[in-house]
Amino acid sequence: MKLSRKKFAFIIGISFLVTIVVGLLLPESLVIPVKGATRADWNSKSFWFHPWGKSGVHKGIDIFAEEGTPVLAACPGIVLYTGSNPVGGNFVSIMGPKWRVHYYAHLKTVNTRGWTFVRQG
């Protein structure tokens, strides 16, 4: 059985739409991603586009801990990319529920690789 281009495009479109909707419907329950950290360990003034250093704006939460403290996944997801850059040092980007990307930076080491699934915590 050979599919016409229209049917094939329709199937691809529906599959894409279902994937988007399912991603948005997945529940998101976050945990603090630094082992042993509490709400008292982050800088609430650095949240939501607060000016931060040379980068100008900063969207996220900085959680402070001793060097070498394990950093865990705030939610389950797929590792999109790992690497290093001058601003964030060693980092990991994870796509979680609701299509949100979680960026973990300033890591001493990275113990995962791209396109792997990680569990929360």
Regions inferred by a protein language model and the residue ranges of each:
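Preference for bulky hydrophobic residues occupying beta-strand positions
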Residues: 61-63, 94, 105
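Surface-exposed, glycine-biased beta-strand/turn segments
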Residues: 2-90, 119-120
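Short histidine-centered loop motifs in beta-beta connectors
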Residues: 72, 82, 98-121
